[in-house]
Amino acid sequence: MPGMNVLALETSTDAGSCALLLEGRVSERICPAGRPHSETLLPLLRELMAEHGVGFAQLDAIAFGAGPGAFTGLRVACGIAQGLAVAVALPVVPVCGLEAMAATVGEARVLSLLDAHMGEVYAGAYVHGEGGQELQSEICLASPEAVELPADAGWVACGNAPA
């Protein structure tokens, strides 16, 4: 999104964060481990925006991590994003974490894997083409052994879960 100023919130995994895309540059803050995202995200968000002298009026949108991930965590980022967006009349953009990870890899075929805990992973297979990336099958929640790659070769895995 060149030229856009976007605040992004992510709390669907253990590593919560907020990021600010401002005039083509990204700055971020990571939530401290061991503390609930509901306690740490807003102070980090305020710190990040204050550091850059940015107010909500200068933003074009607010994005949030729409999962997959922990239900409580999803509600934290979604609720904060929606509350802020309504207050300042900004659009809200949901972002799939698996898709966002795949987009950063720079390979044509990417299997994104997130640890869902309790011996399971969230998985999504993406193919990058001229029009962007396309999900090859439904995102699934499964044991790592049960995750199936599409039949063709050349896949690269990314994420924090075992393949």
Where are these predicted regions, by residue range?
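DPxDG-like acidic metal-binding loop motif
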Residues: 63-92
